[in-house]
């Protein structure tokens, strides 16, 4: 099965999350060991659940097509695979390059822990994308619409008791970069250090502030691949 959705803050008192796993083949069984392929760890689930309307029930077994809710303390990400031991990865759940960007800042220093936890869980849920600028260490949130910024701000305040403020940042495009030429990639990152960031997976992201800057980078560094989705 694979994790297709994560819902953060199911219980605000415990900041709990539920990862939803779609069973694709075989039979899922409670307390049976499963391989978390990305992490290479074996996991057991003593209280998997299924949701019916407002009711949540513990499930002992599930079959292809069923959706199982698994307790998540931060170990899952969307697209993760669970198997009986096979090394298997599902494809088709990429993150696309955002259209809008803003800096996010903690507006209440006394609530730093809540702010950090909220950002982590909301990003894991897929509400938006987070990039950390390697030049100044600032967090950049990328979305496809203005409403997502409002949702993040509302949920941080009402679910995590944290406040944020948004600050403008002029960016044109975020793209993931890779190269088989390690020397050229290193040279690119040094020359473009002001524009380099990391996503939540630790991958290199180029934050171009204009179409011209992006076009020139593509021309000057022929051996670097610029990806506009995270699946490559």
Q: Across the structure, where does each feature detected by a protein language model lie?
A:
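Conserved nucleotide-binding/hydrolysis modules and their immediate coupling elements
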Residues: 1-101, 116-117, 136-138, 191-194, ...
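Charged, conformationally dynamic linker/hinge segments
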Residues: 87-203, 207, 214
């Amino acid at each position: 099965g694979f994790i297709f959705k994560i819902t953060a803050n199911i219980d605000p008192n415990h900041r709990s999350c539920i990862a939803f796993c779609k069973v694709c083949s075989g039979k899922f069984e409670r307390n049976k060991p499963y391989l978390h392929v990305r992490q290479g760890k074996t996991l057991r689930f003593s209280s998997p659940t299924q949701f019916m309307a407002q009711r949540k029930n513990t499930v002992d077994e599930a079959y292809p097509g069923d959706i199982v809710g698994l307790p998540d303390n931060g170990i899952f990400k969307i697209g993760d695979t669970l198997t009986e031991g096979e090394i298997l990865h599902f494809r088709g759940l990429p993150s696309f390059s955002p259209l809008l960007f803003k800096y996010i800042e903690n507006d209440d220093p006394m609530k730093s822990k809540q702010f950090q936890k909220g950002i982590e869980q909301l990003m894991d849920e897929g509400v938006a994308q987070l990039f950390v600028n390697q030049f100044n260490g600032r967090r950049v949130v990328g979305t496809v619409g203005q409403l997502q910024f409002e949702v993040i701000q509302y949920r941080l305040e009402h679910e995590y008791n944290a406040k944020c403020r948004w600050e403008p940042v002029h960016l044109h495009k975020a793209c993931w970069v890779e190269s088989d030429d390690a020397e050229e990639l290193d040279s690119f990152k040094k020359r473009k250090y002001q524009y380099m960031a990391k996503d939540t997976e630790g991958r290199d992201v180029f934050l171009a502030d204009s179409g011209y800057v992006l076009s020139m980078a593509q021309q000057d560094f022929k051996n670097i691949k610029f990806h506009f989705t995270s699946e490559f």
